[in-house]
């Protein structure tokens, strides 16, 4: 007859299956892998204690030693089981969101530049109304130069300069 968890309700609340424990360990080990793959500046922003930070740095050093690296990742997972990982997960999510925000801003600037280049004075007037601090003369000059370079099939230097100027204004 197979063993069952205790019928006592007090004990059944604390019961966690072996499979659930393994899933949690794998999640924490994956979180450790994400920490190892961060850049130095990103890792410096993580709320890690010294022991965990040292373990992550060691894993980076032995990355090309397959078995040692695997065991180090397991050790990082073990260290993380003993700690509250919510702040670490939050910091990683903030890093991911910051990248997504930068990407969306980049796309918005590209769209604005393309609109200014293709729709002419109406788009420029609309942009100036939305951003009164923008230099109308500089924008007109860059747009004219970009159109000229496109007509002459030259590299789009002015379009890049327009992008940089828009990034300064919007970013």
Curated annotation (Swiss-Prot):
Gene3D superfamilies with a match to the protein in the record: PSPTO4464-like domains
Protein name: Dual-action ribosomal maturation protein DarP
Keywords from the named record: Cytoplasm, Ribosome biogenesis, RNA-binding, rRNA-binding
Function summary: Member of a network of 50S ribosomal subunit biogenesis factors which assembles along the 30S-50S interface, preventing incorrect 23S rRNA structures from forming. Promotes peptidyl transferase center (PTC) maturation.
Example GO BP: assembly of large subunit precursor of preribosome
Annotated GO CC locations: cytosol
Pfam families linked: DarP
InterPro entries, alphabetized: DarP (IPR006839), DarP_sf (IPR023153)
Similarity comment text for this entry: Belongs to the DarP family.
Source species, domain of life: Bacteria
SUPFAM superfamilies: PSPTO4464-like
Gene Ontology MF terms: ribosome binding; rRNA binding
Region spans: Disordered: 1-30
Record localization: Cytoplasm
């Amino acid at each position: 007859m197979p063993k069952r968890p205790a019928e006592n309700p007090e004990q059944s609340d604390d019961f966690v299956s072996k499979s659930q424990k393994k899933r949690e360990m794998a999640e924490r080990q994956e979180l450790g892998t994400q920490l190892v793959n961060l850049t130095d500046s990103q890792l410096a922003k993580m709320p890690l204690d010294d022991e965990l930070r040292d373990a992550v740095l060691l894993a980076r050093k032995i990355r090309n030693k397959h078995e040692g690296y695997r065991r180090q990742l397991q050790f990082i997972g073990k260290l993380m089981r003993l700690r509250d990982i919510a702040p670490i997960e939050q910091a990683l999510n903030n890093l991911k969101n910051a990248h997504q925000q930068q990407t969306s801003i980049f796309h918005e600037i590209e769209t604005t530049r393309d609109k200014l280049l293709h729709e002419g004075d109406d788009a420029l007037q609309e942009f100036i109304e939305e951003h009164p601090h923008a230099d109308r003369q500089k924008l007109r000059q860059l747009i004219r130069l970009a159109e000229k370079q496109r007509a002459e099939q030259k590299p789009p230097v002015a379009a890049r300069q327009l992008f940089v100027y828009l990034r300064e204004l919007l970013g």
